[in-house]
């Protein structure tokens, strides 16, 4: 059906489809546009966009409710919207009438439909109960303003007949008026009529009959619709009057009949399909409640006759353009690129939408063609099988070019059941596949696919209106243009006469056009060669920036400027000039050839002019596809050449051409001569002048000669004088021109000799240009054709046109035109190349990654699943993809609490934090173990863990170095100097493990060398030798003996983001967790569990070290503590203090720098190991603490080694149980065996100690009495300090404290030793805790006689799982009485010590309140134990006093953070419960791992105080009794205060009191702090011998 017939259908469709909206005034623009192509002389009034859009129903993705229509619209959203909103397509009629229930009900209240059987109607329109008819929409679609003239809409004669039949024509307006319930006889737009009736309805069939009635209906309906919709906006009569003739479509009859015909039974939903008139009544009357002052119906009746007439007239026109292509709106888009110059931004936007819409429509038409073709095949196959199909259907689409497809074609195609079926199937498939995906994409993905319905109805209407307007403008412009073009063709045909005429006309036009073109880019759209020439000239002038006249006028100024420019150009030779010049020459030659080819150009009668025009024409042709005439020109080149010759031979042309050419020749010669002279004078200027003259000669000469012949003559003189001036002027006018000219001049410089010769040749050639023009015309015809065919050539020409360079280059091109055609070709080739280079489009910078996201780039090229992020893929190559310096801190998955920067506490293993363990330093890529190791070493954060320490470096110096150099940058620090805490820890480890246990590299996990720097990344020193030689060099497994050196899957220090095997992950956790300072417990989490969970690796390592290294009970820790309180304990304190010192702060740093976990881990672990082994003797405090926190208990066990070992074992077991880490379990079992060994050793040591104590008791009691006294004050002093620290720690992570306390309790056996351990753990408070333990140890030494007894019961309790650190005399009493101690076994000590107090509170309270004797006894026993241990260790020479190690072990926990402190606090906390008095502190010391540590110290001969402690312990034992009484009182007071104070405060008080109680421990703690801060090697030295003993 013709578009007009379609239009009514579309209107109906619109009414139905858009029926939901009151009025789907389909784009008036669209209809008009489609009509527009049909030439409508009267420019219809285009309703304002508001008017149009106001009537448009909101275009939701077209949902009609009609499954077929919906399927069609889904499949062809653009096409459907075009047909629907553009009113170009009776979608419903094609696809079948809309079921009544689906009929959109518009404002039903406004329209009263009187349905009656229409006797006249051939087919009764099925009454659509939801009346909103497509007709209503058709009526709406008169909303298509008058503008829309559907030129090609031929409603089939059926439509006319239908309309005639439709007695309810008034109903049409009613329908229109009521976008609503109008049942519109055409529920299925006419297009939809079943194929059988289709013939009548076929658009081609009845365009004429349609026209008259549709005109009437359309106009009346449209009027009514308009008046109804926008009575004010649309003058229905005017709109309809103008537009109706354009589209007669509103043939309700036609639509209805089409529907009936084509879809008699199309959709059951359409009860009254063509065949079935279940709803037999047609619309006999539509009564619209007049919204408008006048009745639409009346007006419709009034206008009906007039409109009928108009529509008849329209129909005649429609016949001419019987079928308006659906893409009628495509013409204006491609029309004049020049038009864009005058287009407003809004127009450009609309045009962009229009083009996008056009592309969409084209794509959908192609798809529809494919579907139709497939349907054709299906039908043919079905017919072959079943015989002939019931009716034959022609498949127009597949045979019709897309741009010629009309609505009728689509209707006819959709008439086919197969096509509809295929469309439905495809739509269903898409709905299934893409529908869900689209929803997902829209909902879930940023790359949400835009819905198929990209354009809203408003957009489409706007687009169509714009297209229609453009079409009208185009038609108008094309009329004149066609006349001009025809004139041009006639000129070509009659070159002599036409050339003469056109030449005069063209010069006038050119001048006018130049002005107009300058003023009116629309003139460009006219695409008149004259205009184009004018525009080209204008462009030349504009390029020159000086209008032709200005150039003429400003010769003097321009000369000066040009001379200057030339000088500048001369100064600035540009090699490009040569290329461009050649290119320009090629272009100019091409242009000349085209000009030669184009009689129009010949008419200019100057090759220069012709060349300029041809260039212009070519450019415009390039710009204006309309100018495809270029090919015609090229084809006509031969004719044109002849014409040119003829024209040139023309007397007028001969005169004009001859005069101009003679003048040009003279000018050119003069210019050339001048240029030669200038060139001789200024070789640069000469070629430039020549080139410019050539360019100007064609351009300027054309302009000047055309405009001012006299001026041309003067210019000949001027040209002789001023050719350079012209060029200079142009150059001055156009810096680009200048540059181009510079290039050309440089080219000319280079080619100057050639050009000089060429200039002569050019003289000759210009003389010969006619021949050349002919020859070149042919050659360049081919070239032009090539160029036309070659988009680059077209682009080049456009580019040349766009760029003044091209125009300027035309000058050189002019010269080249005189040059051989071969040179031209070469130049053109160069031109193409240059254009490719110059005009080339930007391509993807990474073409190989063109379609992929950057994160998918395989930076290493290792391959793998490209769709997966390499981080997530565990590919065989171990790749740490630090892809590039990430602009933002990459998220690091925290594998441990401290790993990953921010991950403390419960979220330790949780969601990766934005905090980058790599310090936001960006990712670097390393492949392979060596590269990874080296990179990690260089990586400061990782280097902390990996960097080998120079064994010679003392902890203090190294720590200072590393402190100075925090790992803040990813730039590989030479050794990635570790942070202070790491360095301290590393030094501590090094001193403890490195020196003392460095030789012991037998640990299963680590070499036991205690070197954090171990090449294997472990805290083993075995690789130190190699590391010393090559610190940063990638470690080779050869250097390191430990397994870790060969990292199969992942080494702890590799902070890779890739998946890590469990073992490696555990190692990572151990290494990085060792750096933890504090563990944040979940509210309901048991501290012990948390400790085990977080510290399993650390515990394991500590146990390993304990097994590997001697237990150091020694007084180094005490000495460190004592150093703070300069007393005897200073001697004892020196070793452990170093480590505890940095434990807290350094651990904090460690925690902060999370990346340094290994170092801190090593230190912490090392203390743990050393303490476990040696600490029993020397550093029981630290060991115990460490054991408590991790498995330091085992280390402490050497003091109360059995008990501590059991505790540590229990802790280890619980930790491995908690973590369920098989590795840890194995290690724990190993640790258990080690603990057993340690227990045995400790028993032996105890025996020795008992022996030694018996010897030393007499001596030491006296000695120790004084220290205890001093201890008490110092304890009291320290209590506040401890309390403060404890408070801080408690406040910080109470949970950690609890964990510490738990560990302490669990280490109750090593309570004595563990007290130092807590201080060690505490690295913040290490001095205090250690100090108090040391005091205890001293008193313990004095008590060593009691120690045997106490040691026995303490050991028994420790074996039972009590934390010996917290054992007090009251506990001893309870134990003696066979009572269960009221202290928790391996209690989780809340930061508040609540759990610890759970058992301890009574026991602690008991200590002061129950029996001072118990305290004294316990203190004595602890001291005795310490003495015995120290004596045994010293005697046995087994320097199990790993005071250093012990400190180290606490250190890891200190690294753990407040955790360690809390342990110290926890141990002290029990005392607070006992009392705040120094006695309570003393009670706290009863955890006298510390005291035993002193004995350990005495045991560890390397530690001076070990022996001293023994002596002192013996002496102080007597004093301890007195002190115990005092402490009892203090404890009572403290308990009272504790009751008053909060648990945190109580704990802090207890801690502080505990320290006061063990005055020396306080000093020791202080000294330990100092030493930790100082990281004195002395402590390390002392520890090392002790460790050696172990």
From Swiss-Prot:
Sequence repeat locations: 493-518, 519-544, 545-570, 571-596, 597-622, 623-652, 653-680, 681-696, 697-720, 721-733, 734-758, 759-788
Bias (Low complexity): 268-280, 1151-1195, 1307-1319, 1435-1452, 1505-1515
Compositionally biased tracts (Basic residues): 1493-1504, 1554-1576
Biased composition (Polar residues): 32-41, 957-977, 1205-1221, 1577-1590
Positions with biased composition (Basic and acidic residues): 1131-1148, 1272-1288
Biological process per Gene Ontology, one example term: response to starvation
Segments of this protein annotated with the region 12 X 26 AA approximate tandem repeats, Glu, Met-rich: 493-788
Name the UniProt record assigns to this protein: Defective chorion protein, FC177 isoform
Gene: dec
